[in-house]
Amino acid sequence: MKVSASVKKICRNCKIIRRKGVVRVICTDPRHKQRQG
């Protein structure tokens, strides 16, 4: 899980979603998991 100020899609499987006001990236590749913080 990467915590970054700006979350970006890395590959075409990445999806940007909002959970409880937190922007997250979910992907089939676990290395692409990110959240904004």
UniProtKB/Swiss-Prot annotation:
GO cellular component, one term: ribosome
Pfam hit, one: Ribosomal_L36
Keyword Ribonucleoprotein belongs to the record: yes
A GO BP entry: translation
Listed GO MF terms: structural constituent of ribosome
Record keywords, A-Z: Ribonucleoprotein, Ribosomal protein
Superkingdom as given in the UniProt entry: Bacteria
InterPro entries: Ribosomal_bL36, Ribosomal_bL36_sp
Family of this protein: Belongs to the bacterial ribosomal protein bL36 family.
Protein name (record): Large ribosomal subunit protein bL36
Gene for this chain: rpmJ
